[in-house]
UniProtKB/Swiss-Prot annotation:
PANTHER family: GLUCOSE-6-PHOSPHATE 1-DEHYDROGENASE, GLUCOSE-6-PHOSPHATE 1-DEHYDROGENASE G6PD. Changing K403Q: Impairs dimerization and reduces catalytic activity in cells under oxidative stress. It catalyses: D-glucose 6-phosphate + NADP(+) = 6-phospho-D-glucono-1,5-lactone + NADPH + H(+). Changing H32R: In CNSHA1; Gahoe; class III; frequent in Chinese. NADP(+) 2 binds at R357, K366, R370, R393, Y401, T402, K403, D421, L422, T423, R487, Y503, W509. Changing I48T: In CNSHA1; Aures; class II. Changing R285H: In CNSHA1; Montalbano; class III. This is Glucose-6-phosphate 1-dehydrogenase. Changing L128P: In CNSHA1; Vanua Lava; 4% activity. It is linked to Anemia, congenital, non-spherocytic hemolytic, 1: An X-linked disease characterized by G6PD deficiency, acute hemolytic anemia, fatigue, back pain, and jaundice. In most patients, the disease is triggered by an exogenous agent, such as some drugs, food, or infection. Increased unconjugated bilirubin, lactate dehydrogenase, and reticulocytosis are markers of the disorder. Although G6PD deficiency can be life-threatening, most patients are asymptomatic throughout their life. Changing G410D: In CNSHA1; Japan; class I. Changing A44G: In CNSHA1; Orissa; class III; frequent in Indian tribal populations. Changing E274K: In CNSHA1; Corum; class I. The lineage of its organism: Eukaryota, Metazoa, Chordata, Craniata, Vertebrata.
């Protein structure tokens, strides 16, 4: 194996930036203003401010970039610094750079539905160096209930008249098809589609982005990536912790809206889509939309819903169930686990079940895509062979591995399960991978929308799940209880077995490399 040359974080992201621009220069001479709407909130202090700091520290932001925080709270830059700096992971050697970063920060207090507040924000931005000509990037780190008022006021009072204007919208993008359509229609009446960046941070993860390269840059996968060879596809998202005092927010949306309708469905698209004409943003998103249009609405008999209960043998939080969270409404029937089977009704995937599983308080932290292949025809090993699987492990410990049969070492001629393994932490141990938010925010500065959700994608995603969500809200079925720290309801395993997935339980991938 060739030795990897150590690359700094700046070099890695710089290469990415060069790829995004396809050789064009990154316009360091332009003035940019990055406006964080909702600057006093958790998302801002834990994710957005740290991400902007990392990009600034590594020289990846345009040279003349200013950061403006906006929220209702009467704060100062010192307050913002106190809240967010613990998440920066800054070293003592970066002290001067940190001072330079906060010197570029400012803060404006104002209401979200008050025109005068936005006029004051605009005056503040115009007063910055070349601020009236600056490119403006608005990050809506806000609850969706204020999106309409905020976007309307931004459009009326805060748009740059010379530079470009871009807006980043955080999920949830509505609660169902109808509310999503209303929000999309409102935002699209104010901004062009090329100005709107609907962010799903999973699309910024290394292994999710690797799906396209894995599929379309390797000849070996093309002939087998179809219904003739693949028996089923399993997309999994597991968290080993519960709501831990944040159940009030979660209860409003539930696990399907929180994870399945966005993260897992986006990964499904990348697995199932046809080869795009190019890596141009719209070429890629066109193919994703085609996949979604081939998926029918979820059928109730292909759904299992669960809710975690305390583990009597556990410790600490593990002893508490979802309903023990004081922020959760008493008697809530909101699901913390869901397993859903979808079918892509086209020539490539006809009859192949796509199984989406996600949940809280499960036995491990894991997100992965697993393709299970059909049994080998003409078995000569007396049913000792297990199905081959290709696994793309998104988190933790990014990896691609193929589960396959090899001869068991020794005197006997017996097959046993093993794997061909590419663990990123070992093969690329000197490469510093950018955080998902770093990659995506850099994409917005560069104007690349490939890893953002287009309005027609969003509409099709909600079309698939809205009837099920409405049925759940109307009938309020009681979710199946499962123990904190388990694999989830056994009924989910039974559903997967019914549609064709074979779970042997005899093999578990173990990271073979000390990271």
């Amino acid at each position: 194996m060739a030795e990897q040359v150590a690359l700094s974080r700046t070099q890695v992201c710089g290469i990415l930036r060069e790829e995004l621009f396809q050789g064009d220069a990154f316009h360091q001479s332009d003035t940019h203003i990055f406006i964080i709407m909702g600057a006093s909130g958790d998302l801002a202090k834990k994710k957005i401010y740290p991400t902007i700091w990392w990009l600034f520290r590594d020289g990846l932001l345009p040279e003349n970039t200013f950061i403006v925080g906006y929220a209702r709270s009467r704060l100062t830059v010192a307050d913002i610094r106190k809240q967010s700096e613990p998440f920066f992971k800054a070293t003592p050697e970066e002290k001067l750079k940190l001072e330079d970063f906060f010197a570029r920060n400012s803060y404006v207090a104002g209401q979200y539905d008050d025109a005068a507040s936005y006029q004051r924000l605009n005056s503040h931005m115009n007063a910055l160096h070349l601020g009236s000509q600056a490119n403006r990037l608005f990050y809506l780190a806000l609850p969706p209930t204020v999106y309409e008022a905020v976007t309307k006021n931004i459009h009326e009072s805060c748009m740059s008249q010379i530079g470009w204007n871009r807006i980043i919208v955080e999920k949830p993008f509505g609660r169902d098809l109808q509310s999503s359509d209303r929000l999309s229609n409102h935002i699209s009446s104010l901004f062009r589609e090329d100005q709107i960046y609907r962010i799903d941070h999973y699309l910024g993860k290394e292994m999710v982005q690797n799906l396209m390269v894995l599929r379309f840059a390797n000849r070996i996968f093309g002939p087998i990536w179809n219904r003739d060879n693949i028996a089923c596809v399993i997309l999994t998202f597991k968290e080993p912790f519960g709501t831990e005092g944040r159940g009030g927010y979660f209860d409003e949306f539930g696990i399907i809206r929180d994870v399945m309708q966005n993260h897992l469905l986006q990964m499904l698209c990348l697995v199932a889509m046809e080869k795009p004409a190019s890596t141009n943003s719209d070429d890629v998103r066109d193919e994703k939309v085609k996949v979604l249009k081939c998926i029918s609405e979820v059928q109730a008999n292909n759904v299992v819903l669960g809710q975690y209960v305390g583990n009597p043998d556990g410790e600490g939080e593990a002893t508490k169930g979802y309903l023990d969270d004081p922020t959760v409404p008493r008697g809530s029937t909101t699901a913390t686990f869901a397993a859903v089977v979808l079918y892509v009704e086209n020539e490539r995937w006809d009859g192949v079940p796509f199984i989406l599983r996600c949940g809280k308080a499960l036995n491990e932290r894991k997100a992965e895509v697993r393709l299970q292949f059909h049994d080998v025809a003409g078995d000569i090993f007396h049913q000792q062979c297990k199905r081959n699987e290709l696994v793309i492990r998104v988190q933790p410990n990014e990896a691609v591995y193929t589960k396959m049969m090899t001869k068991k070492p020794g005197m006997f001629f017996n097959p046993e399960e093993s794997e061909l393994d590419l663990t990123y932490g070992n093969r690329y141990k000197n490469v510093k991978l950018p955080d998902a938010y770093e990659r995506l925010i850099l994409d917005v500065f560069c104007g690349s929308q490939m890893h953002f959700v287009r309005s027609d994608e969003l509409r099709e995603a909600w079309r698939i799940f809205t009837p099920l969500l409405h049925q759940i809200e109307l009938e309020k079925p009681k979710p199946i209880p499962y123990i904190y720290g388990s694999r989830g309801p056994t009924e989910a395993d039974e559903l997967m077995k019914r549609v064709g997935f074979q779970y042997e339980g005899t093999y578990k991938w173990v990271n073979p490399h000390k990271l």
